[in-house]
Amino acid sequence: MVADVLLTHFNQLFCLNDPGHPLTGQEMKKATIVEDGYIAIKDSLIVALGSGEPDAELVGPQTIMRSYKGKIATPGIIDCHTHLVYGGSREHEFAKKLAGVSYLDILAQGGGILSTVRATRSASFDNLYQKSKRLLDYMLLHGVTTVEAKSGYGLDWETEKRQLDVVAALEKDHPIDLVSTFMAAHAIPEEYKGNPKAYLDVIIKDMLPVVKEENLAEFCDIFCEKNVFTADESRYLLSKAKEMGFKLRIHADEIASIGGVDVAAELSAVSAEHLMMITDDGIAKLIGAGVIGNLLPATTFSLMEDTYAPARKMIDAGMAITLSTDSNPGSCPTANMQFVMQLGCFMLRLTPIEVLNAVTINAAYSVNRQERVGSLTVGKEADIAIFDAPNIDYPFYFFATNLIHQVYKKGQLTVDRGRIL
């Protein structure tokens, strides 16, 4: 087979044999590091991988050849938890955070999520589209090729749908692949204050059926937290969403452990998000149900909290984990997955191999894209992040700098030295 594109002489390729399930426990520590590696691409797919000189049959008169001495290649990075589409920003809350005002106290004062809800409700489709596109561009420049994007800053049907429509439009227009999550249950809207059950009934009866019918989202999510939605309320919504055919995610055990992990395990959610306050029993329940733990260390960093999710304990117990930005305007205003990956080492005490497995193959399972992306594997799409680094440890050791040299998306050179092509 003659390749369309042949990428050669990488210092290292980060490869693994996809076992057919998210990596857990000791599997997280394993990878195949190919020295002097090459990748052959044809029709957007990886068709060959190896070390040294490529087979002669891969090279034809039209084959594009590129050498990458001094560089490494990983699968395209996957950010599997973002709140991508929103109006406004919340830098005016930063001084309060520095003064020690808590996230929940800011929310109780009418700030936080509810502040962004007001800004998003007043934002036009074009405004939301352009703002979200800028964030996606930034993510792409940092090596991200697949992104999960939630609604949840409308809390009414008109605005929630506008958010989902923005995600759908960007999925068509932007190089990054988007996976949509419906999260109208992100907070209790002011018009339903004191009556969350009535709001959940509106979501179940009036919103979810339309989201499903119009294929606007693949996943359904809810914020199970003190002063937001209880475990029983979360179970009520997610069980109905599951009956309609949605895959499930749940924000759980972020600020307090109130039973969200139990709901995730009972309903076999694909992932439980945050988990800073998870208990040993909660870890065991998620392992038993095969739920992926999606950890968001940049949120803990941004909130200036001391308690990070117990990632080391999770992996050692046999749990599958991922890492994501939680990109949002309040608790985590960043879109930089390289920073998150570095926090995975510095604050969660993971190794570079564990982090790379978390943000590639496990993240692919978290967004139900494991058949297409998540590993440098023959037959998968050629989503490739190329780092200006001599080995896979270097991007973690040399922190707070964008080390992306190039990005390939579906076999096409999409980013080249800081420029989107």
UniProtKB/Swiss-Prot annotation:
GO biological process entries: L-histidine catabolic process to glutamate and formamide; L-histidine catabolic process to glutamate and formate
Location in the cell: Cytoplasm
GO CC, any one term: cytoplasm
Binding site for Zn(2+): H81, H83, H251, D326
Keyword tags: Cytoplasm, Histidine metabolism, Hydrolase, Iron, Metal-binding, Zinc
Pfam families: Amidohydro_1
Residues reported to bind Fe(3+): H81, H83, H251, D326
Cofactor note: Binds 1 zinc or iron ion per subunit.
Main location: cytoplasm
E.C. code: 3.5.2.7
Pathway given in the UniProt record: Amino-acid degradation; L-histidine degradation into L-glutamate; N-formimidoyl-L-glutamate from L-histidine: step 3/3
InterPro entries per record: Amidohydro-rel (IPR006680), HutI (IPR005920), Metal-dep_hydrolase_composite (IPR011059), Metal_Hydrolase (IPR032466)
Residues reported to bind N-formimidoyl-L-glutamate: Y153, N328, G330
Family classification: Belongs to the metallo-dependent hydrolases superfamily. HutI family.
Function of the molecule: Catalyzes the hydrolytic cleavage of the carbon-nitrogen bond in imidazolone-5-propanoate to yield N-formimidoyl-L-glutamate. It is the third step in the universal histidine degradation pathway.
Protein name (Swiss-Prot/TrEMBL): Imidazolonepropionase
Organism: Streptococcus pyogenes serotype M4 (strain MGAS10750)
This protein's encoding gene: hutI
